[in-house]
Amino acid sequence: MNNKCKIINRRKSDRIYVGKVAIGNNAPISVQSMTNTRTTNISETINQILELQKVGVDIVRISIPNLKAAESFKEIKKQTNVPLIADIHFDYRLALQAIKYGADCLRINPGNIGNKRRVSEIISYAKDENIPIRIGVNAGSLEKDILKKYKIPTPDALVESAMRHIEYFDALNFNQFKVSVKASDVFLAIESYRMLGKKITQPLHIGITESGGLRNGTVKSSIGIALLLLEGIGDTIRVSLAAHPTEEVKVGYDILKVLSLRARGINFIACPTCSRQEFDVINTVNQLEKNLEDISTPIDVSIIGCVVNGIGESKIATLGLAGSHKKSAFYEDGVRQKEKIKNEEIIEKMEIKIRKKIDKLNNSKKNN
């Protein structure tokens, strides 16, 4: 496809850093997730963070519901090397402790963090340690006076909540922050981000909150996040799923991959199958995806069950397979190879060939 069709003009935004991860001002869109372990279970939380790192997470958020969790956060921070965000609600003092214990960023909720004095104290501590903050507005926890004014969560309500706290930050000359205005309703979230994006230059953390289980949540999040990204809105993302956090990261990268905003791992092109398929495409793709989850190098691999589209797709993929009777045609860099692969050996042989190609690409980069 003509690359001109893939250009997304991103919204101009300021640059902040969460740890060493740049956010905003055309930095690569970062993928976040959140642990769902008990923070006080230090070993379990660390293990989940390591799992998230294996699938490419850039930033991890951890809930700090009480002082004991804050103390656990301190130990977790010592034993991990990915930027950690302390998620704070209700008790502003926990934000102060999290900063003290090494948080790379704070998330505070305007709907429950308290009055201006409390926010000012958090900002003072964050300034001293050069720690950024996310103003995380959520449709499900708006301030009482705002909810009374608008009756129900609306884009105006979410944006007013965000702007109120942005004014606090501006008054204290604190500009190291990003903002989110999340809702579980896709239309509400999208319109809220559109409105906010026109008012401020700070980076925007985007997502559809509480989007549901793995299937429904993936669909809902993909639609909401992708629509915003296509409009150039969004500097960092989280796919919120009622599923294992690693699934959030995988879906996040898939969204960015589809939009050519960021690539990680293998992009499988696979047919939906019909009676023309010469081998079990569904099982083949599922097994290859599972076996090759560790791959981070971006390449396109086409697995098509017959020659109708198999040849054409293989010619534009890094590696391709066009199904044929008993043996299938194999392509590399668009060129058909002399070797054919027995259909019963496709999973094994293709995994070997993909890994070999990845090694070749990585070695070529090193030599250059």
From Swiss-Prot:
What is the primary gene name for this protein? ispG
GO BP terms: namely: isopentenyl diphosphate biosynthetic process, methylerythritol 4-phosphate pathway; terpenoid biosynthetic process
Q: Where does [4Fe-4S] cluster bind?
A: C271, C274, C306, E313
Q: Keyword Oxidoreductase: yes or no?
A: yes
Q: Which cofactor does it need?
A: [4Fe-4S] cluster
Q: Which family does it belong to?
A: Belongs to the IspG family.
Q: How is the cofactor bound?
A: Binds 1 [4Fe-4S] cluster.
Domain of life of the organism encoding this protein: Bacteria
* Keyword check for Metal-binding: yes
The name this protein carries in UniProt is: 4-hydroxy-3-methylbut-2-en-1-yl diphosphate synthase (flavodoxin)
Its recorded reaction(s) are: (2E)-4-hydroxy-3-methylbut-2-enyl diphosphate + oxidized [flavodoxin] + H2O + 2 H(+) = 2-C-methyl-D-erythritol 2,4-cyclic diphosphate + reduced [flavodoxin]
Record the organism.
Answer: Buchnera aphidicola subsp. Acyrthosiphon pisum (strain APS)
Q: Name one GO molecular function term.
A: 4-hydroxy-3-methylbut-2-enyl-diphosphate synthase activity (flavodoxin)
Per the UniProt entry, the Enzyme Commission number(s) are 1.17.7.3
Keywords of the record, alphabetical order, are: 4Fe-4S, Iron, Iron-sulfur, Isoprene biosynthesis, Metal-binding, Oxidoreductase
Q: Which PANTHER family match?
A: 4-HYDROXY-3-METHYLBUT-2-EN-1-YL DIPHOSPHATE SYNTHASE, 4-HYDROXY-3-METHYLBUT-2-EN-1-YL DIPHOSPHATE SYNTHASE (FERREDOXIN), CHLOROPLASTIC
Q: Where is the signal peptide?
A: none
Its EC top class is oxidoreductase
Described by its record, this protein's role is as follows:
Converts 2C-methyl-D-erythritol 2,4-cyclodiphosphate (ME-2,4cPP) into 1-hydroxy-2-methyl-2-(E)-butenyl 4-diphosphate.
Q: In which pathway does it act?
A: Isoprenoid biosynthesis; isopentenyl diphosphate biosynthesis via DXP pathway; isopentenyl diphosphate from 1-deoxy-D-xylulose 5-phosphate: step 5/6
